Swiss-Prot record:
Protein name: Non-reducing polyketide synthase nscA
A Pfam family hit: CurL-like_PKS_C
Gene giving rise to this polypeptide: nscA
EC primary class: transferase
Active-site residues, Swiss-Prot/TrEMBL: C586 (for beta-ketoacyl synthase activity), H721 (for beta-ketoacyl synthase activity), H764 (for beta-ketoacyl synthase activity), H1375 (proton acceptor), D1564 (proton donor)
Length: 1819
């Protein structure tokens, strides 16, 4: 406050004359705004105080207070007639005044932001809630009357607004206690009237003096002998009036007794609860009992900060502390007399100016009262004649205002936005448009039960005599309930058939609702998959109990159990938020929505998908509902009709997508409506469990209204539950009318309340009923029309309240406009009640009016994308879009591009184009759809995106304005350029921004500016591509572009790149003459140029240098300018195309020699690091993976020597980094490198970042489309982010499904027949396995003994282990292949030794040492660790020891983690022989010198360079081509490798890392040398194959391996004559000179490398998965893959879990595959580019490019058959395609044709004809 003003804040003792309920509602609404955080704290603290005080009341008083969650919940309760009237009135007045004050002052903090308070003028220095506020001692004073003084005291004790929130709650406590105490004392003086009539305890008398009134009262009290306690007395007085107080009957008697009083002007005051200001009644002990109670949490020593005037003396209270102040106030309230004249005088005295500088007086109050008007008059009288202003401020006005969009204080304070919806409803309402049309036309969807549900001829009996038959034939049913796109949702036909149709349609409608909402998981924080949950209501299991139970299959549980309905949605979309399936009977759907809202308010999710599900098939439910008298026998739900006789059943599926409002607005969503409140309660007091209860329904309405702070009169539409039952309609009409259209206050004529009930149209959808009602309400909001009610067939039900019309409420009997009032929002309520007693209510309001930002749209080209998972769907989606555009030609192209790219989930079948107008798009779509070869030309993209290489151009592409549009449009790109530019300027170089902005003069730039501009642009472009979601696999730089490439690869920093380029340019300018040398681009290879020039005398002696070998046909040469011109003339004369390059210097020639030394010196100061991504080097013509080759000398050479771009590309191809599918992005001002790449690899997709004379945004847009069609998923959200507010999400036609009917009909009459069955079945208990029992044998790998038998000479042992146990799992993950943990055979070795020693000691207890020879090891199926956390992965080991043969057999089996059932066949077997170690020692002693000799030979050959010596890192890097070992497994310190022979120095890690017999990592370390030989030697074809071991003949250790000990291993592998694909060898383990162990005849098999991914699949991604074939797995035997399963330490192969195939009875179509890529080069893309098709160079035969032909040729080649033999009826079994060949074929299809299929497809499509038909549709 300005120090030149004086301020008084006056707290009244009366409520304002406003609608108190509305005032509290508005306070509550503001408290949910984070800008009013302190108001919220105060209300929460006050609520807690009241709850605490109520809890301490005696039971009779406590029962008078209903449960409440906030003070708003008490506003509707009338306490005036009860003993708590004073307490509630006092505390609520305190809360109201302090709440208004806190909110008012909070606004002062917002003044700079909020300019909407035109009726108030504030001057404040508030900056935050914690700053010193403007109620300054000495300048501000507080005053009040009665209870108002308590509110003022809270302010007086506060030094900040935050203090008021805390002390204010204590003032509320004192107010409540004071009221309770006063009422209790007063009722002892006079009993309240029994009829509840309120009598006043105080009257005001005017035009009499205090003395005159006192005389009359004294006389009355004397004459009537009134006891002291009940006497009538004066409680307040001023010059013009006197307040008389006493028991009501005594006051009445006093006025009758005294003629003076009887004829005086007097009025009763609204004081109904007792006496205050009565010194004769209260004592200090009374005051102490209220103020100084032990429960009070007043801080006793809190100082009084502001003066508070006494209402008795008009002077400030003298108290210094809080406790003193409240005692003074309590004394005054209970015993003091109010003297208003003193209060006025005190205020005037405070305002009396002490200085001429005081320019204004300010009085803040809560509305104007008689008392306040008197104060104003007195102050104005004092001001008369003075140049001072009296400012009156009302602290109430602000509460009725809105201050811009609400900013929720917390999730719980947020409004919620419904942003998407979808449905399948009766009457053919398979989408929202059809549903609305049905409603608008007033259609009734009633029909009889369709035959596909059940046969009415047998299951319908209107007499009710037939047991289990229905008595009504009617219902409302959705069309084609079995139709489903199984392939889209990755389900096999078998699984789809077994899955409940309502769960299938939940998937479908969830997708459609998400599509409508524009949800792309992960696009925004609120749509991150971990923050999305699903909530669906379901109340029946018809499909599981009836249809699917006729033949229970594998998918019976996941297909039918309710939880899987939600779980499948979460799993498919990879949502990891909560998944709830709710059953609240008829209200399940809306209860699920309410649960979703609760989760959003609780912050458990950020996006929720909710809905209700019901598909009727089971006649049992018809019978049960009919027998319980729920169902109408006459037809449809007749809501509010006189003849209403029950409901009519209905199907229904509905889904909605909900977010918090602020998230929806931030995400640029279309908001269909806003949820203000949602609640569910129960009719606990109903007369029966199924009977509705009006009281419970009304309580629920109040809860929702209070939650939202909404006046029920403002609600203008209610969608009733409306079932059409006599009880239900009567009760709901009563509850709705009483709350929303009460008798008083009445609705105004313009406040009509309309009612509707969708069940009249589509029946009662049971669990889906609530969601259908909600969808209708949302459509009413969208269409601004309330559809006609068709439920009254005769006359209105007489049980409906008769006065509804007088209350201005009624059904909309015809289509009724429901316009949105200007500047206001419409409110609607949706009801849904459950037959079990539950009541759910939602309160909705209009979406915020969205003002679309009108930008200057200068993007001349837009990308339009469509995708699908099958060709039919893609074609249908294109047709739908074309039809939409034909109907809506005004559609914004920008909005369409935004919607189809940034706001869509994308699939594998893709269409994309870049267009500049809608008509152009229509033309492209028609062209594609008219193409008869559309199906064959459309190619799906691969599941695995192709690699992307960035190619950085040189300075030859420079021009002014390069990237200008990107710089202007994209803040991220602009920021990157500006940051790099600032670095350049700090290094002393000129700014490049004018070049990019094109604000520089169009004159030749200096080399420094040219080169810096190019490098900075390229680094910024590379980062921009990363922002757009492009993952870079490698980089290559051409000349100057190599600096940018090295920076992007992390070899040098961006700063160093700029520094080196700038200094290099400076050196060139200083030491090289411009124009003395030139560069010539020649369209010919180097050798031809040389020959042609040598043949001509004029040029034979010219010295030139080759600067660049760009392609095999493009060469750049350099030299002296004159000589280069001579060469040009000579070559052009020979018709060779030549171009003089527009560069001032001839780089990569002798001209730059003068700068090389200094350049290298500068570069030596720069740190070089290993590249983070491979660098393709045009200097070295290789791919660089490490830092060894990259140094200062490299940059020197790169400046001087030839840029061999062509050789670099060829090297990258040879090294497997580049193939025909690799995508190239030219990063630079103009696509020079892109052209070079296309010349080298004609089929290569190459695109540009910028292009001369083309808008760079358009260039990027086209390139993004090309990337998209190639299988890359760009981050479209970032592309549209700069202008997202300018775009609107369009509601386009929904996805067109490729549906097939998966329906299992109910056959027979067994639901009727079971009524006559008299026998039952005994349930069986499933087998279970417990792994927590004590076990005599427990190690890291052997966890529990499950069976043990020990006899005299034999013993048998069964153990069980869990591969997911941490120790076991860590052992497995020490040996990973293709990112999967695979059990190495050293694990089986340790388990064998563990069990062998245990059993042997059981039979021979006193044995000192047990020496075992592990023989005949055969691992049939590898074991791969499950990726599922928390899963159980058990395996069983069975061992049998026979002492008579000194041997033990072992077998390992997989077991089912749920049932404990052990597999029939083992996955590994072995033998242990208990032998004499002396025999081993003798055997090995004879061999030791031979082994040591071979080791010495290897050492010698290594020293001579004839054998390779590998360091530890290099050895395991070679190993990593197949297997990645953890550190503990990496025991080989060095290796000498000579073709198939090798030796290794080994040091075991000292740690055992667990409990073992022999740690697996030690076994592996001494023995996996054999695997390295086969997988790392030059003698092996490691490019096409990898090598694994299926077993060995023996494994022996003379003594136990020792921690930290050093060993040597030696092996020589050789081909086995019986199998050319198999190698074998012995691994010797030496310690010192002695052989201490041996792996005898380890066998290693060669396996095609293309099967690596098949056997070792990487972890699944979080994106929406691609389609899969119908089988979840297939059986692959070890021998079927040429015995390639693993044994000892070499890599091992997994086995796919068997899953027998059962053909579907209803559908046999296999689902679509993961798609393959179709791309074209950028140059072939027209300005309005249609769908991109395969480049001609990619096709094997330009004449025959049919995919079927390619597939047949591939199959013929791989099987060795002629193509002619592959006839349509030929079966794969007859053709010899076994499981191994199917694996190979599926990999070949992927690798060569880009077709992703599972090998199980050869089982699903057993003939050539079926296979080709499938390929034709999906490939």
């Amino acid at each position: 406050m300005d120090s030149t003003s004086r301020r008084v804040v006056f707290f009244s003792n009366e409520f304002p004359n406003d609608d108190l309920k509305e005032l509290f509602r508005r306070l509550d609404q503001h408290s949910k705004d984070r800008r009013f955080r302190l108001l919220s704290i105060f209300l929460e603290e006050s609520t807690a105080v009241l709850k605490d005080e109520v809890s301490k009341l005696p039971r009779p008083l406590k029962e008078l207070v209903p449960p409440f969650d906030s003070v708003l919940g008490l506003v509707d309760v009338d306490f005036r007639q009860g003993p708590l009237g004073a307490a509630m009135e006092s505390s609520m007045l305190t809360i109201l005044e302090l709440g208004l004050f806190i909110g008012y002052v909070s606004l002062l903090c917002l003044l700079d932001q909020v300019k909407m308070l035109t009726s108030l003028v504030y001057t404040s220095h508030y900056e935050s809630e914690d700053t010193e506020w403007d109620l300054v001692p000495g300048e501000s004073v507080l005053a009040g009357l009665s209870i108002g003084i308590l509110a003022a005291a809270a302010v007086a004790l506060s030094s900040s607004l935050a203090d008021v929130a805390k002390t204010g709650a204590e003032a509320v406590r004192v107010s409540f206690r004071l009221g309770v105490y006063v009422a209790d004392i007063s009722t002892k003086l006079e009993t309240p009237q029994s009829d509840g009539t309120l009598s006043s305890w105080a009257h005001v008398v005017t035009e009499m003096t205090e003395a005159g009134v006192q005389d009359e009262l004294r006389q009355f009290n004397t004459d009537t002998h009134s006891p002291e306690l009940t006497k009538v007395f004066i409680s307040a007085a001023d010059k013009t009036s006197v307040s008389v107080s006493g028991p009501p009957s005594r006051i009445k008697a006093a006025f009758q007794h005294s003629p003076v009083l009887r004829y005086s002007k007097s009025l009763p005051l609204p004081v109904y609860d007792g006496l205050c200001h009565a010194s004769h009644l209260y004592t200090q002990s009374d005051i102490d009992s209220i103020i100084n109670s032990a429960e009070s949490v007043i801080v006793a020593d809190r100082s009084v900060r502001l003066a508070l005037l006494s209402s008795q003396t008009g002077k400030p209270f003298i108290a210094k502390t809080a406790s003193e102040l409240f005692l003074e106030i309590g004394t005054e309230l209970l015993t003091g007399t109010i003297y208003l004249d003193n209060v006025t005088a005190g205020i005037v005295q405070h305002l009396q100016p002490q200085s001429k500088e005081i320019s204004s007086w300010q009085i803040d109050s809560f509305r104007t009262s008689l008392v306040l008007r008197g104060i104003h008059s007195a102050v104005e009288a004092k001001l008369s004649g003075e140049q001072r202003q009296l400012i009156r401020r009302d602290l109430v006005n602000w509460v009725n205002k809105d201050f811009g969009p609400r900013q929720p204080r917390s999730h719980a304070s947020s409004k919620l936005a419904i942003v998407g919806m979808a449905c399948r409803l009766p009457g053919g309402a398979n989408d929202l448009d059809l549903f609305w049309k049905l409603l608008e036309e007033g259609r009734d969807t009633l029909t009889t039960v369709p035959p596909d549900r059940f046969d009415l001829n047998t299951h319908y009996d209107p007499t009710g005599k037939t047991e289990n038959a229905t008595q009504t034939p009617y219902g409302n049913f959705i069309d084609r309930p079995g139709f489903f796109d199984a392939g889209f949702f990755n389900m096999s036909p078998r699984e789809a058939e077994q899955t409940d149709p309502m769960q299938r349609l939940a998937l479908v409608t969830a997708y459609e609702a998400l599509e409508m909402a524009g949800v792309v998981p992960g696009r925004t924080p609120s749509t991150h998959p971990s923050r999305i949950g699903t909530f669906y209501g379901q109340a029946s299991d018809d499909w599981r109990e009836l249809n699917a139970s006729q033949n229970i299959s594998t998918y019976a549980v996941p297909g039918g159990e309710r939880a899987f309905g939600n779980g499948r949605i979460n799993y498919f979309f990879k949502f990891s938020g909560p998944s709830f399936n709710l059953d609240t009977a008829c209200s399940s759907g809306l209860a699920a929505v309410q649960a979703a809202c609760s989760a959003l308010w609780a912050g458990e999710v950020d996006t929720a998908i909710a809905g209700g599900l019901n598909v009727i098939t089971d006649p049992d439910n018809y019978c049960g509902l009919g027998n319980a008298h729920f169902l109408s026998k006459t037809g449809q739900c007749k809501v509010w009709d006189k003849d209403a006789d029950g409901y009519c059943r209905a199907d229904g599926i509905g889904s909605v997508v909900i977010k918090r409002l602020e998230d929806a607005e931030a995400d640029n969503d279309n908001i269909l409506a806003v949820v203000l409140g949602a609640s569910t309660n129960h009719s606990a007091e109903a007369i029966s469990i199924t009977h509705p209860h009006a009281g419970a329904q009304k309580a629920n309405y109040r809860q929702v209204l209070n939650q939202a702070g909404v006046n029920p009169i403002d609600v203008s539409y209610i969608e009733l539950h409306g079932t059409g039952t006599q009880a239900g309609d009567a009760v709901e009409s009563e509850s709705v009318s009483d709350i929303f259209a009460p008798v008083t206050p009445r609705r105004r004529p313009d406040q009509r309340l309309y009612l509707g009930a969708v069940k009249s149209n589509i029946g009662h959808g049971e669990a889906a009923a609530g969601i259908a009602s909600l969808l209708k309400a949302l459509l009413v909001y969208q269409k601004n029309l309330i559809p006609m009610h068709i439920g009254i067939k005769s006359v209105i039900n007489p049980t409906i309240p008769k006065d509804l019309e007088r209350r201005n409420v009624g059904l909309a009997m015809q289509n009724t406009p429901w316009p949105r009032p200007a500047g206001k929002k419409r409110l609607a309520v949706v009801n849904s009640f459950g037959a079990h007693g539950g009541n759910t209510t939602l309160l909705l309001e209009d979406a915020p009016e969205r003002v679309k930002i009108q930008g200057t749209e200068d993007r001349i080209t837009h990308s339009i994308l469509l995708s699908a998972k099958s060709k039919k769907s893609l074609q249908a989606n294109m047709e739908s879009l074309l039809s939409y555009l034909d109907q809506h030609p005004e559609t914004s192209l920008a909005d369409l591009a935004y919607t189809t790219s940034s706001r869509r989930m994308h699939h594998n079948m893709r269409f994309g184009t870049s267009v500049s107008c809608i008509s152009g798009l229509q033309k492209v779509l028609r062209s594609q759809l008219d193409n008869v070869n559309f199906a064959s030309e459309v190619r799906p993209v691969p599941n695995e995106a192709p690699s992307v290489i960035l190619a950085f151009t040189s300075q030859g592409a420079y021009y002014h304005g390069m990237g200008r549009e990107l710089f202007a449009e994209f803040p991220y790109f602009r920021a990157q350029v500006q940051q790099l530019d600032r670095l350049a300027q700090r290094l002393g170089f000129p700014s490049v921004v004018p070049v990019i902005e094109n604000s520089i003069e169009d004159t030749p730039s200096s080399p420094i500016l040219t080169q810096l501009s190019v490098v900075i642009l390229e680094i910024a472009l590379a980062r921009f591509w990363s922002l757009l979601g492009v993952s870079i696999s490698a980089v290559i730089g051409h000349s100057l572009g190599e600096y940018a490439a090295l920076a992007v690869a992390g070899v040098i920093s961006a700063t160093d790149a700029i520094y080196l380029v700038g200094r290099r340019a400076q050196l060139v300018e200083e030491r090289c003459a411009q124009g003395s040398h030139s560069m010539l681009s020649v369209r010919a290879p180097e050798d031809e140029i040389q020959k042609m020039l040598a043949a001509e005398p004029e040029t034979a002696s010219i010295a030139y240098e080759v600067s660049c070998c760009n392609t095999n046909q493009d060469t750049v040469i350099g030299g002296l300018t004159g000589e280069i011109n001579d060469i040009r003339r000579t070559l052009e004369a020979k018709s060779i195309k030549c171009t003089i390059l527009d560069v001032p210097y001839a780089f990569h020639t002798a001209q730059v020699n003068p700068i090389l030394d200094d350049l290298e010196t500068l570069a030596k100061a720069v740190p070089f690091k290993a590249p983070s991504i491979p660098v393709i080097s045009p200097l070295l013509a290789t791919v660089i993976y490490d830092v060894k080759s990259l140094n200062a000398n490299y940059l020197r050479r790169a400046t001087r020597e030839t840029v061999d771009f062509a050789a670099a590309i060829e090297a990258a191809q040879d090294m497997g980094l580049v193939d025909s599918k690799t995508i190239w992005i030219d990063v630079g001002p103009h696509p020079i490198c892109a052209g070079l790449v296309r010349s080298m690899i004609p089929s290569a997709p190459a695109m540009s970042s910028c292009r001369r004379n083309e808008d760079s945004i358009a260039t990027i847009s086209k390139s993004l489309v090309t990337l998209y069609l190639a299988g890359i998923n760009p981050c479209w959200a970032e592309f549209f982010k700069p202008r997202e507010r300018e775009y609107s999400l369009l509601h386009l036609p929904k996805y067109r499904w490729n549906e097939i009917d998966y329906w299992i009909p109910y056959l027979g009459t067994w639901t009727l027949d079971k009524a006559h069955l008299k026998h039952g079945t005994k349930p069986t208990t499933p087998f279970s396995v417990s792994m927590s029992r004590p076990s005599a044998l427990r190690t890291s790998l052997v966890h529990q003994i499950t069976a043990e038998t020990v006899e005299a000479t034999t013993a048998t042992l069964h153990t069980i282990s869990d591969m997911q146990h941490p120790d076991f799992l860590e052992a497995i993950h020490g040996h990973t292949m293709n990112k999967c943990g695979v059990a190495t055979s050293s694990i089986w070795s340790d388990m064998a030794f563990t069990v062998g020693e245990y059993l042997y000691r059981r039979l021979v207890p006193n044995t000192k040492d047990v020496h075992m020879n592990l023989t005949d090891v055969e691992v049939l199926h590898a074991q791969v660790a499950s990726k599922t956390k928390g899963s159980v992965q058990p395996l069983v080991l069975r061992a049998h020891l026979d002492l008579s043969t000194s041997s033990m057999s072992l077998s390992w089996f997989n077991a089912n983690g749920e049932t404990g059932e052990c597999a029939a066949e083992s996955f590994a077997t072995a033998m242990i022989r208990f032998e004499d170690p002396m025999a081993w020692r003798k055997e090995w002693a004879r061999l030791a010198h031979l082994v040591r000799g071979r080791i010495e030979v290897l050492e010698q050959r290594a020293s001579e360079g004839k054998a390779s010596r590998l360091s530890k890192p290099l050895a395991y890097a070679l190993f990593k081509n197949v297997v990645d070992y953890a550190d503990r497994y990496r025991g080989m310190d060095s290796v000498v490798l000579d073709e198939l022979e090798a030796m290794a120095e080994v040091t075991l890690v000292p740690e055992r890392y667990g409990t073992w017999h022999t740690p697996p990592h030690w076994i592996d370390s001494v023995s996996h040398l054999a695997g390295l030989v086969m997988n790392g030697s030059d003698a092996s074809n490691t490019r096409d194959y990898f090598f694994v071991t299926p077993g060995c003949d023996s494994f022996r250790l003379l003594k136990k391996l020792e921690p930290g000990a050093q060993y040597r291993s030696y092996v020589r592998m050789f081909p086995l004559p019986e199998d050319p694909n198999m190698h074998g060898g012995d691994v010797y383990i030496l310690q010192g000179e002695e052989i201490v162990g041996m792996v005898g005849m380890i066998r290693i098999r060669r396996v095609p490398r293309l099967l690596m991914d098949r056997f070792f699949s990487p972890p699944t991604t979080t994106s929406v998965a691609g389609p899969v074939p119908p089988l979840s797995g297939e059986t692959t035997k070890y021998h079927d893959i040429a015995q390639t399963a693993p044994a000892l330490p070499a890599p091992t192969l997994p086995i796919v879990v068997p899953n027998p195939v059962a053909s579907s009875t209803m559908a046999s179509k296999a689902p679509e595959p993961a798609p393959l890529l179709a791309t074209s080069s950028e140059s072939s893309t027209p300005k309005e580019s249609p769908i991109v098709t395969p480049a001609e160079s990619e096709r094997e035969d330009p004449v025959d490019n049919n995919m079927i032909s390619q597939c047949l040729r591939l199959m013929a080649r791989e099987t060795g058959l002629e193509v002619e033999a592959l006839t349509a009826d030929a079966s794969f079994v007859q053709l010899g395609v076994d499981s191994l060949m199917s694996l190979v074929l599926s990999e070949k299809f992927r690798a060569e044709l880009g077709v992703e299929i599972k090998s199980s497809l050869f089982l699903e499509c057993p003939t050539i004809g079926e296979m080709t038909a499938w390929i034709e549709e999906y490939c």
